[in-house]
């Protein structure tokens, strides 16, 4: 084995030379990598008193969920009072116009989220960019895709009973309410969630809440093929803990239910809610009940940028994990101007893992709702990002970028069946029928389209759409 021995001797000589001739502080081999760990942002709670509107707020007030809700920003006047002269006049003007002409969600931002914005660059701040969109943020020619829809995933079409979407064979989505402690500009349920805005008169549940919950429970009991329930809305953080505990507790008792996921952005946007004694007590009772019934009970949160994560969020997460929840996972949304770089996705994923003990899980491509084109990425851009983040995180914590294809469901972005890059149309297939296709013989043979933002297409593709040429709805 002389060749191997010679190679080993050479490696030892190089190691000795490095240790004797080069100071260790100058050896930085990892800095040649496209991404360098750890993230450069300090994990701290920003001082809210730096903002003019919060200058006199005490720590006790800041930690109060009631105070946070009462002082959430609901309009431009309140936003200006928080930031004072720090918010540029042209940004105020642009947000005002957007609220009148483009916004699909009303403004609602808790102080906790406002405090994570960069007050020295509000135009460029990623959290402001998706929570409080400005007219100038939107694409001037294509604010909406021609195929955008209010309920782009057709969730209401798949309601087995009001508020219960049965899209996958073994999984359902229970929309318990239509409000949140914060309203995201890109909300995929903009058709149902939140207050009316000039552009959108929201649909409303017709059944009383109690009757709706009873109908959902009855359906789950009568449908043994369902084993997995996502409890969402809206946001469960807006449901009184007694109501949440009653509903989820009853779902836990159903024999065929093995997995329950509680979905909330509030754990990031309003962690104070989950640090209240009554909420913690109710959540602990649910965790213990789930364990006793051999049901996996997990929490899914929605964080899009590392700046949103603070020690207060980590405290709330760790308290919940200590109670016996199966896991707390993050499902972010991939958005241009927010997290559309490998660095942004990796910074967020590492901060989730290292500081909050939240598992990076999914990044969804932004759905094709009206006036969302400036946030959306093309499928090939998402594929490139997925490639770029591989190899840095543990395999079990590497988030998957997925496309939620209408009438199909989640698909990893590399699962596309065919892709016309020139026209920006990708085609996808599926191996199951949704709740509205049980008698459709062609459902498993059909190819389902998804559309790239038109401004990402080559000139010829853009001209195709400008000319109004018909794009096939189904291939």
State where each predicted segment sits:
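Flexible, acidic/Gly-rich N-terminal and inter-domain linker regions that tether
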Residues: 1-166
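C-terminal accessory extensions appended to soluble enzyme cores
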Residues: 1-28, 382-475
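N-terminal pre-triad scaffold of radical SAM enzymes
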Residues: 106-109, 157-190
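Conserved, mostly hydrophobic/aromatic
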Residues: 113, 176, 184, 262, ...
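Short helix/loop capping segments that flank catalytic or ligand/cofactor-binding pockets
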Residues: 184-186, 195, 437-439
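Iron-sulfur (Fe-S) cluster-binding segments and ferredoxin-like electron-carrier domains
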Residues: 189-199
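Short cysteine/histidine-rich metal-coordination sites, predominantly Zn2+-binding motifs
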Residues: 200-208
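Conserved AdoMet/S-adenosylmethionine-binding subsite of the radical SAM
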Residues: 210-224, 228, 234-393
